[in-house]
Amino acid sequence: MVTTNINNNKSINIISKDITYFNNNNNNNNNNNNNNNNIFLLNEINNQQDRINQLRIDDEFINNYHHTHQETINTRGRRFFKFLLKFNKKKGSNSDTIQVHFFTPYW
């Protein structure tokens, strides 16, 4: 159910209570999908217990990514792996940076 191999599949399925993303250049929290400049597509599906977010990465816009923070936590008996992805755009404003915080199962 959860895909974490970004290099091959260009997608991640995320089980999360919360996801935040913002434009570092504007120093402004941004929860509006319309202002993301097609850098990534975020689909949210509400389950009875968890929200499942799918993050799809497009190589045309993404230049680089890396894990900048990681830790393990326990949630309802399941281990989760928290990390942050940092994206740099190839097109548009070259200095824009998108940071995405999310939790993904770590088995």
UniProtKB/Swiss-Prot annotation:
It comes from the Eukaryota. This is Putative uncharacterized protein DDB_G0287673.
